[in-house]
Each structure stands twice: as structure tokens, then as C-alpha cells.
Amino acid sequence: MKKLLWWICLVVAPAVLIAVELFHPAHFTANPGMYQFLSHAEHHDPQFSALAYFGPRWWFVLHMIQTPMVGLVAVGLWLMVDPVSGADGGAAIACAWLARLAIFVFLIYFTVLDAIGGIGLGRTILVVQGLLAEGKLSQQQFDGVVLMLNTMWVDPLVGGVGSFVSQTGSWAAFASAVLVAASLLLSGRAGWANMVPLLGFGWERQTSHASPQGPIAFGLLIIASVWLWWSRRRRDIARSLPA
């Protein structure tokens, strides 16, 4: 069961995230503005990093996919330190438990961020557009709604960029990677070369989950995970051979 979970959480889920986050735009907050950009489809523009953006319905669907996939990744990171036990020493155990705490914080705050700035925002934009098309919003009311949404997007506590929620989730992701790597290194269950892509995942994920950092991060996670699995498998085979 754990083998199946490993491949689902650390290979399949990151691969899905790579696929969807290639179409997750960035750098639109200041110009043209959050609502002004997300409210309609956009062709590829290097300024916004994504291969393309398909409109507010895609923003909703993207985050509906992304949220559970990140949950699976969190389970996968937890599985990485699952074998660490009392025989591995106090430092390794301490790092493993701190890693679990960081993974928990990452999962909670990333889910909050996606719920507010992804799923909720996407549906809100669609509802606002529907009300405007039906004539139930005056232009003045519409302008007020747009102002409110743009203001919430940069809110220091729950906004989609640079907020407490966003930064907490991002740094918790980085801390998770660092602490998982530390636990595995201290326990002798992984080497430095194997942990470099895991640390790269944490740093890139801390920087952003939009394109291109998001796809790069999850690509590095796949490399680190497959490498770690292969190393453990080879070690187990070596131990099973007669002396």
C-alpha cells in the first residue's frame, strides 16, 4: 500500500501539477491588474510566464485540480520520513517530526490560499460576469466589485500574492523539504546528491507555484522521489543477498 501511495503522491500527483501549472499565469497583479487579466482568456505572453490562460473557468478548474494534488504531495513528503525510527538517532528523529509539522502547516495554508485566491475567486468572477450579462449589476456596481476583488487579491493577510497566508504556505513548503532532507541525511537513508533536487523543489516551490517555478519544483520532486526509491530498493536487494 505504501509503495502505491509513494508513486501516486510523489510521481503521479507532481506530474499532474506540472501539466496544469504550465497554464498558471503570474505577474499580472500590477499590470493589467488581477481582475483585468483573469476575467478573460489570454494567449501566451512571456510577461505572464504561462503557456496560455483559458479564462476564469480555467482558473477555477485549475485550482480544483491543484488543491487535492498538493494534498497528495504532502502525504508523499510525510512518507519520505516514515522509515526514520529510534535506531536512526535523536537528531534524525527530531528533524522527522519537525518535517511533519512543517508539512502540516504547508498543507493547511496552501489549501486556504487555493480556496480563497483560486477556487473561490474563480467562481466569484464567473458569477459577477453572469450578473453583469443579465443586467443585474450597473456599471458603477460592477466597478465596485472589481475594486473589491482587486483589493482582496493584495490583502496582507489572505491575498493571493505576498500575504501572510501565501508566505506561510510557501516557507512551510521550503522548511518541509529542508527538514525531510536533514532527517534522511542524518539517518543515512539518503545521500547529498539525492537531496539536492529535493531542496531545489522546496526553494522553487517557496518562490512560486505558478509557471515556471511550479512546474520546475514538481519536476525536481519527481527526480528526488524516484532517485530515493531506487536507492532504497537497491539497498534492500543488497541486504537480502547472502554474505
State the predicted function of each range.
Residues 1-243:
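Hydrophobic, aromatic-enriched alpha-helical segments typical of multi-pass transmembrane helices
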